[in-house]
Amino acid sequence: MKKLVTIFSLLAIMLFSISTAFAANEKITMMDEDYNLKNIHTLAIYTPSYKPSALSIERKAKLPNAPELITPDMLTEVIFKVAKEDEVTYTLLSDKDVIQNITIATGTDITTLSNREALAIYKENIKNYADAYVIFTFANDSRVVMFADVYDAKDNHWICSYQIIGGDTEDDNLENYSMFMHKFFRTLTIQSQK
């Protein structure tokens, strides 16, 4: 009986240590320590930068029942869903709303421009619609990684950078990105309460 208890104890310790070793690694860096995150009442979401992993593309090509490839629009939907679940205290603006407002105000449809030109016009006009904006970037190499850079809309000053690196077992799917975004919004909320 004693040996059985010892074996189960060792097994439990081993399982907890394995899950900790493969857990996602996250880091937030405040670029401007003087900026008060409580000043953010409206946060605009810029179109996420995302490219499917080679493994996802290969699966889609070879397997008939493979999951659908993720698109930036799908990621934007997840961002809004997660923000609603986490009950964030600020208003979120979608990239489509901001782009539509910029098109009406300037007469320029930035979706027809190159990324560089579109971002320049976006940065020039975002101050009219939001207090800050966030640019999400997703990388899919050997590990799934999400970056979120938050900028002040008034002067495009870099406020903070958030990075989360998935563990070895994380895959290129919406469930993982949803988990990453929950962590991002919770971290942003905690930082704003400091």
Predicted regions and their residues:
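Bacterial N-terminal signal peptides that target proteins for export
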Residues: 1-8
